[in-house]
A protein has these predicted regions:
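A cross-family phosphate/adenosyl-ligand binding-site feature
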Residues: 1-187
Length: 187
């Protein structure tokens, strides 16, 4: 567990390909860069990572509980205050909900509130395919997030888009680019 010399990084993962590598691809390298990490997952991502044992590994690594459900109003906050949020991977559904202000689970509530908090950086990596990107609402969703000050890690140089089910097998998410965007957002 890190002492968090750089502060607390709120890592939020959604049910998209690559979430299974959240620990090794994003959390461990963030700790190596000096962050204390607090992990929150969407309900489906939480279910997936509990089944694989990753939630337990993340909790052991970070020393904090992994959140995927809301707490009761009288319960203590399980995570310290966050200095920057990073949403990776962000499914097309999560991007659409964040862009339109829908906050129907713990992960969306935390990030949605962060987008409206002055001075709190938010970085989002949309893990989408070419069909998602051609949807008529997609560009507006990205523009809406950017207008809210969100640092969007997106483009062919970062994540080339493929048609559904045509991406090369074993393709890793651009974790280094995501962490570099966190560094840039927190300077």
């Amino acid at each position: 567990m890190s002492s968090g010399k750089r502060g607390v990084l709120g890592v939020v993962g959604s049910a998209a390909g690559g979430v299974e590598a959240l620990r090794t691809g994003l959390v461990e390298p963030a700790i190596d860069r000096g962050w204390q990490v607090a992990v929150t997952l969407t309900p489906t991502a939480g279910h997936w990572l509990r089944l694989s044992g990753e939630v337990e590994r993340l909790e052991k690594l970070t020393g904090l509980p992994v959140r995927d459900e809301p707490r009761l109003p009288g319960d203590a906050r399980p995570h310290p205050p966050v200095d920057c949020y990073v949403v990776a991977p962000a499914s097309a559904n999560m991007v659409a909900k964040l862009a339109t202000g829908l906050m129907d689970n713990q992960a969306l509530t935390q990030v949605g509130e962060a987008i409206g908090t002055l001075g709190l950086p938010v970085v989002v990596f949309p893990r989408v395919n070419a069909a998602h990107a051609r949807h008529p609402a997609w560009r507006r969703h990205l523009d809406s997030l950017k207008a809210g000050g969100v640092h969007v890690v997106y483009g062919p140089d970062v994540w080339p888009l493929y048609e559904p089910r045509e991406a090369p097998a074993g393709r890793e998410l651009p974790w280094v680019a995501v962490l570099d965007a966190v560094d840039e957002a927190t300077r």
